[in-house]
Amino acid sequence: QKILPVSRILLGGALESPGAEVTPGVLSALAVPVSTKNPDPYEISGQLQGRRLALAKWIVDPRNPLTARSVVNRVWQHHFGKPLAGNPNNFGSKGAKPTHLGLLDWLAADFMEHGWKLKRLHRMIMLSATYRQSGSHPRLDKLKNEDSDNSLFAYHLPRRLTAEEMRDSLLVATGELSHVQGGFPVMPEINMEVALQPRMIQFSLSPAYQPSRTPGERNRRTIY
């Protein structure tokens, strides 16, 4: 029978400075136990198998107050350019309070009830009256004065596109987008001056950047 390796706290994050021994467990601050049968309900069983599964089940436990809310908050931010709850990287009691707490909770509950399906969540948001609002408003100046950052989502604010979205859109518009998926990593064309610079990989110099040979290989989707 295999013995579990001992895990220790690394002081300062350094491998050379192991500290006290630590056992697998979850955040007790969230008050969502792994099992009430264990002496420590927040400790994951010491068995060799099942530790990752136990952690995964704890993450998606309906009682977990963060996971579903964090996901729907991110999706909302993607579509509107700003989240319902500010500080999405620091989600929780120390972050900014949600502007629409009831909506955030409802979206999170609906998301879990329907199997954590992201496509359904995207579709629901994009078909909403809020998402389909115009950027103009009969009292736009008054709204901007009273709600300068549009935290109430009274009108549509243009969202900055990512470089990946812009590249894919250009390839679609020109009819050059390749819909092939899988296989080796794609190397798109980049600025020649950048491509000719030697690359540092694993502490050694690598040859200059070489794009994939044919347009069919280069013009794959940036985002899957």
Where are the regions that the model predicts?
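Primarily short, surface-exposed interaction patches in extracytoplasmic proteins
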Residues: 1-221
